[in-house]
Amino acid sequence: MTWIGLLIVGLTAIAVQGEVPIVTRAEWNAKPPNGAIDSMETPLPRAVIAHTAGGACADDVTCSQHMQNLQNFQMSKQKFSDIGYHYLIGGNGKVYEGRSPSQRGAFAGPNNDGSLGIAFIGNFEERAPNKEALDAAKELLEQAVKQAQLVEGYKLLGHRQVSATKSPGEALYALIQQWPNWSEEM
């Protein structure tokens, strides 16, 4: 490799350092929304951690398939206009783009307004997500503050605090209570 090639590679690494890579909707083959979605003003005061409660994924192909299946289910069976969460975290340690943070989510009923929905792909009732997934979520939260998607002093909540659900599962719920910005109250 020439010195110019090394310089370009080095500059690229510097440009992306500190930002969690996000798998875009186009990359996981999302459908477009099938209806209007209410907007929200960002930065948001809350981040809500959930789990999808279904199967987990550990590689790019399987995680993308889970994203497509979840979107199909939420749009056809739950009658949402799009996938309900803003971001999802795969067991491969990657963050998947859901709906825009400036659009109201569809995961917490009346508490969707003002909440950034982040769901881990899988069921985390008995076991926690792996380190790669947990690290990706923590980096995503930091990045969301830097990008003015969340206010600096946002409240971190578990899905069960804003909805009648077991989500994000006992194992994951116990972990997020130790994270920065954790809040007992909305």
Swiss-Prot record:
GO terms for biological process: defense response to Gram-negative bacterium; defense response to Gram-positive bacterium; detection of peptidoglycan; innate immune response; positive regulation of peptidoglycan recognition protein signaling pathway. It is found in: Secreted. GO terms for cellular component: extracellular region; extracellular space. Keywords: Disulfide bond, Glycoprotein, Immunity, Innate immunity, Secreted, Signal. Gene3D superfamilies: Peptidoglycan recognition protein-like (3.40.80.10). Residues 1-18 form the signal peptide. Changing residue 62 to A: In strain: DI7, Draveil, Loua, Monty5, Tahiti, Texas, S30 and ZW141. Peptidoglycan-recognition protein that plays a key role in innate immunity by binding to peptidoglycans (PGN) of Gram-positive bacteria and activating the Toll pathway. Has no activity against on Gram-negative bacteria and fungi. Shows some partial redundancy with PRPGP-SA in Gram-positive bacteria recognition. May act by activating the proteolytic cleavage of Spatzle and the subsequent activation of Toll pathway. Recognizes S.aureus PGN. Belongs to the N-acetylmuramoyl-L-alanine amidase 2 family. This is Peptidoglycan-recognition protein SD. It comes from Drosophila melanogaster (Fruit fly).
